[in-house]
Amino acid sequence: MLKQHKGHPLARLWRALPEAVRLSPHIYMMAASTTGQWLILGWPERVPEADEVLPPEPPAYRVLTGVVDGFGRTLAFHRAAEGEAAGAVTGVTDGAGRRFHLALTTQAQRAEALRKQRATSLSSPAGPRSASSSSAFPDTLPAGTEYGTDNGIRLEAVWLTHDPAYPDEQPTAPLARYTYTASGELRAVYDRSGTQVRGFTYDAEHAGRMVARHYAGRPESRYRYDDTGRVTEQVNQEGLDYRFEYGQDRVTITDSLNRREVLYTEGEGGLKRVVKKEHADGSITRSEYDEAGRLKAQTDAAGRRTVNRLHMASGKLTSVILPDGRTVRYGYNSQLQLTSVTYPDGLRSSRKYDRQGRLAEETSRNGNITRWFYDSPRSSLPGAVEDGIGVTRRITRNRYGQLRAFTDCSGYMTRYEYDRYGQQIAVHREEGLSIYSLYDSRGRLTGQKDAQGRETRYEYSAAGDLTATISPDGKRSTIAYDKRGRPVSVTEGGLTRSMGYDAAGRITVLTNENGSRSEFTYDVLDRLTEQRGFDGRTQRYRYSATGQLIRS
């Protein structure tokens, strides 16, 4: 069908679909929402040719072949037609025309690659003389798992193979790379520089059970499980540890500071919800849900109940009744977009949308009106904004939606440039004022240079923490961190400030450049209760049952 009746709730969204998709008899479409995306479901293998006299029977199932947004941009999935990976997604084309290749491997290919790696290592004079330390890597995986059949196919790398903005640039390395254990579990993730950024360890006796994980440059977190596979302990180096105890519809969580929380649950499967929470200070909060698992009421630690009224069909929030009886009401249009909010004092804010469902006008509760203008019916982002006093600012974007130029109310224009990774490499302001940015292979900002050639440089740790800033005159300021990435000292101009933390990551002491100290104390809910200043004076804080500061 080329067109839907104009009164149909999906009529506008239907027009956003490519004509070939709308007219195809072999494609199913499913709308995620009245303003959102179409999910395109096609044949799992080949599509019958138009001239086939007796086309084959329709398939028993359909696979996701694309996602079309409300402006006609398509995210297309390309699947392997043959081989061991037949039917698997091996390519993606995004709405801007960029093409990505998903490199897949089988268990046998990974095993062969490891054998070649071992052979090369053994033949190298500097390599080990025995491979006995390496565990066996089988050519196949067990056919059946508790999640179904495992064909052993895994994602090895993601490559950007074509970028319309940079058609002549060919990739030399993948955007991301993945390695796996002999059991097919994800072992490590590498970024485009080849640096490992994530690592995982698994239980040798329980396939797929993760027992440790870490980020680059950060300490490892480890997990222990009970006989049913539930986590019973999480151990975090240089941080808080947690113990988990499971009862009937109850989970008790105790940290290494001996703080205890209890979560009480109701429901089963995907509808299980936390209906009561006992906090470390003994206070209790409650939550209520409807049959669909949607939040309908909450009671705070002081016993005050807030009620959410939901639309029976859409589930949209229509009103909130506050503990004192005051009500906030919400209105929607036929596309289920928020159009109004009426506050307890009678004031009202409102929104208007254009035919494409884009925000066109917003009136605040004090009467100020902001308007948005778009360059074309297929633009999802505004090209101009007019504020409450009639001042207009213009915005130009590149094909990827990034800000390319901004013109303020006086006509002053600022222009922006980006590299192929989407990183901002230049900002050009009026009168020749420009800033140029440099990045390393991991995408971290390493330098900024102005139009006069004055450069500021930046250095980082393996974890990505900024460790040094070198100004154009050569002066160097440094920041030191603990293993968890928290700054423990800042040195600038030969003077140092330092910070100390407790196991929960709360700052407990500040030492300034002349050695004076400021100390901090907290309660079991991490609220600041006492501060001893650099001058030696002490200030204390008290809170209500709901966490509001009531005395200082």
Map each language-model feature to its residues:
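Extended charged/polar low-complexity repeat regions
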Residues: 1-552
